[in-house]
């Protein structure tokens, strides 16, 4: 379901990340940050997804942006 189709895998991972943030799923956020980066998503694109998730999910979603940052940091450390 997350591979290339009418929407490419990169776009689907961005959608999945936004949904993970609004669902407040720490595990899902970590997985989809990693999969997004592996699919070629930029940090700027992840930041934009975070902004959309905050608009859609409000304050509760905002608190989970820290989990996105943690996942980005872990990915960078593992691939430095």
Language-model segment annotations:
Residues 15, 19-31, 56:
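Short, thiol/selenol-centered motifs that function as redox-active sites or metal-ligating centers
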Residues 17, 48-62, 75:
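N-terminal hydrophobic signal/anchor transmembrane helix of membrane proteins
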Residues 31-46, 69-72:
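Iron-sulfur (Fe-S) cluster-binding segments and ferredoxin-like electron-carrier domains
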Residues 1-13, 61-80:
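Acidic, glycine/proline-rich low-complexity segments that act as flexible tails and inter-domain linkers
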Residues 10-14, 43-49:
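Alpha-helical scaffolds flanking conserved acidic
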């Amino acid at each position: 379901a997350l591979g290339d189709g009418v929407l490419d895998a990169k776009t689907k991972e961005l959608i999945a990340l936004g949904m993970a943030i609004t669902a407040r799923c720490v595990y899902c956020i970590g997985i989809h940050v990693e999969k997004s980066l592996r699919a070629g998503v930029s940090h700027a694109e992840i930041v934009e997804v975070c902004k959309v998730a905050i608009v859609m999910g409000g304050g509760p979603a905002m608190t989970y942006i820290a989990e996105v940052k943690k996942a980005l940091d872990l990915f960078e450390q593992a691939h430095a």
